[in-house]
Amino acid sequence: VFCLDFSGSMSGDGFDELDDAMNYILDYDRASKDKLQFSAKDKITVITFGSHVYNTWHASGHDTDELRKNIDGSVPTGTTALYDAVIKGLDILNKDSDDYTKTIIAMTDGNINVGTFSDLKNKYKKVKDEIPIYSITFGSAEEEQLEVIADLSNARVFDGKTDLLTAFKKVRGYN
């Protein structure tokens, strides 16, 4: 599950970086050059958020054109409800089959100003699997809140601004 920050604080470079990153990882040919492509069996969910969860889109590993079009056609606006988006991701993964490795990747600047960490923590305690919640930062990232989320789920925070390829490789390598 990708939780994509489409809030107003991502306007400009942050959103451009996020958009480029998603186009890269969802493009089979480009991603396969770095051995990061999704397999045909992979299930991909993209949750977009700003002031609240805006959209939830689903695709299989090789059928990502519609996801890319939806992301490309989006405009950042609103505040930052990352906790709500991650909770939505946990709900989706908690209902999903045990046949898959489950991961949440938040792609954000980390300026969370809607919702509470305690809501996320309470939800996390109720999920049946230990699901890592990684963050890849963009724009003028605020990493403190993201580090707390990573600590909760035994994950990490990566800098998407300086070395996106390494961030993707590490996240994919942990799974």
PLM feature spans:
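Von Willebrand factor
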Residues: 1-58, 85-86, 103-107, 137-141
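Alpha-helical membrane and juxtamembrane elements of multi-pass inner-membrane transport
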Residues: 4, 65, 80-83
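A general structural motif
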Residues: 41, 99-101, 130
